[in-house]
C-alpha cells in the first residue's frame, strides 16, 4: 500500500508540472488518468542482467511527456507497479522511449519485461516526477552520484543540460558499479564527456576487478567515500551566483551512507519537508537545501 501511495503522489506532482507546459510543444502521450499501451519495438541485453527496451508511442510526433528527471510506472495484470526512469528525454526523442531495466531474479515486473517479445504491449502510467525538477539556472554546478540503475534519472539530467546550447551548468558524475562490465551507459557517458570536456566529467568506481584487468581511464576500484566525493563533486555553495546542487540515486545503502539513515523516508511532493540531511554529504558541508535524493 505504501508503494501505491507513493506512486499516486508522484503522478500528482508531475500532473502539476504537466499543466504548466501542456499548452505548448509537441503532443504528449502520457495522461495521468489513463494507462498508455506501448508496443515493444526492440530489446537489447547490455550487460549480464540489464536490458535496453524501446517502446513505441502513438505516433512519430508524440513525446512521452515527462519532467526531467521523471519516471513512469510499468503495470502488470495484477496491478503491481514498478517505477522506471527512461533514458530518453522529450527534448531529443519523439515516437518512442527507451527503458534501461535490470532483471532481478524473482522480480515480477522485470521478469515480465525480460520475457516480452517484439510487438507485445506494456501498460505504462505517468507522468511521474519527484520533488526536484531540473530547469536551466537551478545551479551553476551539479554533482550527480549514482549506483547501478540509479544512473537513469541522472542521464536524463545530463542530456537536458548538454543538449541545451544556452545552459552553461557544469556537471560532475560519480558512478558506482559492481564491475566494469556492469557500468551501464558508459559508451554514451564517455561520448558526452568527450564532446563537452569543460562542462561534464565522469568518474567510475567499481567494487571489484578481475585479476590482471586493466581499468579504463577514470575508473578505480573501491567505494564511494568522503575523499572521492571531495575530489570530484563541486564544493558546497559559496555564494548565490555559484550555487551547487548534489543529487543522489541508487540503492538504499548508498542513500543512507551519503544522505543519512532516514534518506528513504523523505516525502516526494513539492513543498513537503524531507528528513534532515546526514551521512557523508553533511560531513562534507553540504546544506540540506542543496541535496536531493531521487
Feature names for model-found ranges:
Residues 6-14, 174-294:
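Reductase modules of NAD(P)H-dependent flavoproteins
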Residues 126-138:
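A short, basic/flexible loop-to-alpha-helix module at the beginning of a structural domain
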Residues 141-143, 172, 245:
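Structural motif
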Residues 139, 162-171:
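Conserved S-adenosyl-L-methionine
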Amino acid at each position: 500500500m505504501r508503494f501505491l501511495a507513493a506512486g499516486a503522489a508522484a503522478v500528482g506532482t508531475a500532473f502539476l508540472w504537466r499543466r504548466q507546459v501542456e499548452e505548448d510543444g509537441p503532443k504528449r502521450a502520457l495522461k495521468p488518468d489513463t494507462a498508455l499501451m506501448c508496443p515493444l519495438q526492440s530489446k537489447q541485453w547490455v550487460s549480464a542482467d540489464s536490458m535496453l527496451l524501446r517502446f513505441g508511442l502513438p505516433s512519430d510526433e508524440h513525446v512521452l511527456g515527462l519532467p526531467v528527471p521523471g519516471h513512469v510506472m510499468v503495470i502488470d495484470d495484477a496491478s503491481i507497479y514498478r517505477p522506471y526512469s527512461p533514458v530518453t528525454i522529450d527534448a531529443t526523442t519523439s515516437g518512442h522511449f527507451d527503458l534501461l531495466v535490470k532483471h532481478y531474479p524473482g522480480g515480477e515486473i522485470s521478469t515480465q519485461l525480460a520475457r516480452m517479445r517484439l510487438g507485445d504491449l506494456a501498460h505504462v502510467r505517468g507522468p511521474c516526477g519527484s520533488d526536484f525538477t531540473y530547469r536551466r539556472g537551478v545551479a551553476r554546478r551539479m554533482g550527480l552520484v549514482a549506483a547501478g540503475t540509479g544512473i537513469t534519472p541522472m542521464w536524463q539530467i545530463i542530456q537536458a543540460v548538454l543538449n541545451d546550447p544556452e545552459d552553461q551548468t557544469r556537471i560532475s558524475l560519480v558512478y558506482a558499479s559492481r564491475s566494469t562490465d556492469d557500468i551501464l551507459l558508459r559508451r554514451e557517458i564517455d561520448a558526452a564527456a568527450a564532446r563537452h570536456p569543460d562542462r561534464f566529467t565522469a568518474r567510475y568506481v567499481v567494487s571489484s576487478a578481475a585479476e590482471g584487468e586493466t581499468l579504463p581511464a577514470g575508473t578505480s576500484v573501491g567505494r564511494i567515500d568522503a575523499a572521492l566525493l571531495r575530489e570530484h563533486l563541486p564544493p558546497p555553495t559559496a555564494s548565490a551566483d555559484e550555487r551547487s546542487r548534489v543529487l543522489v540515486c541508487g540503492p538504499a545503502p548508498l542513500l543512507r551512507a551519503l544522505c543519512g539513515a532516514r534518506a528513504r523516508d523523505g516525502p516526494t511532493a513539492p513543498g513537503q519537508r524531507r528528513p534532515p540531511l546526514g551521512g557523508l554529504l553533511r560531513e562534507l558541508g553540504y546544506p540540506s537545501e542543496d541535496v536531493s535524493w531521487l
